[in-house]
From Swiss-Prot:
Similarity field: Belongs to the methyltransferase superfamily. RNA methyltransferase RsmG family.
Enzyme kind, highest EC tier: transferase
Gene that encodes it: rsmG
Catalyzed reaction equations: guanosine(527) in 16S rRNA + S-adenosyl-L-methionine = N(7)-methylguanosine(527) in 16S rRNA + S-adenosyl-L-homocysteine
Name under which the protein is recorded: Ribosomal RNA small subunit methyltransferase G
PANTHER family per record: S-ADENOSYL-L-METHIONINE-DEPENDENT METHYLTRANSFERASES SUPERFAMILY PROTEIN (PTHR31760:SF0)
UniProt GO molecular function: rRNA (guanine-N7-)-methyltransferase activity
Free-text function comment from the UniProt entry: Specifically methylates the N7 position of guanine in position 527 of 16S rRNA.
Subcellular compartments: Cytoplasm
Length: 204
């Protein structure tokens, strides 16, 4: 497994050390709770960490960042690690209904020395969170994600949703139920994938 350096990732040495601690924790916990697939674990930095960093790099400023279905911490905890130095004013909430994965997220945040609230609830049971920034990766299709955005994204806020090669079809399907504006940013790690930056979500 290739591990990049701080310069390659364009992060400080302190942030890079936190990312390495996090990567080690994923390797330690993964055999027990399957945070990522065994195959993608071998390419953890490119498939998951760098993929999450590009979400952070495309985010606007905001006081509250909510990551839905955080799972193994991608992108939520990775973004929180970068924000600790680069956007210290931003608060992070990770929502994860699986109690074991929530325990991992809390442990990882503590060991990486970052502030991140972990909520162990199903997303649909939560009161509106009023997020400035909303992210979710590999959670559900875009139609479902926009339903979460309508409830939890502040008016004027931005949703950041990484999507795979079928993203255009997901956009077409979502447009049948939702009005929204979007910008599709080509992924650095997968040429056919994009990061969707979405604003102005309302029902059709």
């Amino acid at each position: 497994m290739m591990v990049p350096d701080a310069n390659t990732l364009n992060v400080s040495r302190e942030t890079f050390e936190r990312l390495k601690i996090f990567a080690d924790l994923v390797h330690k916990w993964n055999p027990r709770i399957n945070l990522v697939s065994k195959r993608s674990l071998e390419d953890l930095w490119t498939r998951h960490i760098i993929d999450s960093i590009q979400v952070f790099r495309n985010a606007p400023k905001g006081d509250l960042w909510v990551d839905l279905g955080s799972g193994g911490g991608f992108p939520g905890l990775i973004c929180a690690i970068l924000a600790a130095e680069e956007k210290p004013e931003t608060q992070f909430i990770c929502v994860e209904s699986d109690q074991r994965k929530s325990a991992f997220l809390r442990s990882a945040a503590r060991e990486c020395g970052i502030a991140c609230q972990v909520i162990s609830e199903r997303i649909e049971h939560l009161d509106p969170l009023d997020a400035d920034i909303l992210s979710a990766r590999a959670l559900t299709d875009l139609t479902g994600l926009l339903g979460f955005a309508e409830r939890h994204l502040k008016i004027g806020g931005t949703a950041l949703f990484p999507k795979g090669a079928a993203w255009k079809k997901e956009l077409q399907d979502a447009a049948k139920q939702w009005n929204f504006s979007y910008d599709a940013v080509t992924s650095l790690t997968e040429p056919q994938a994009v990061l969707l930056k979405i604003t102005g979500v309302t029902r059709v």
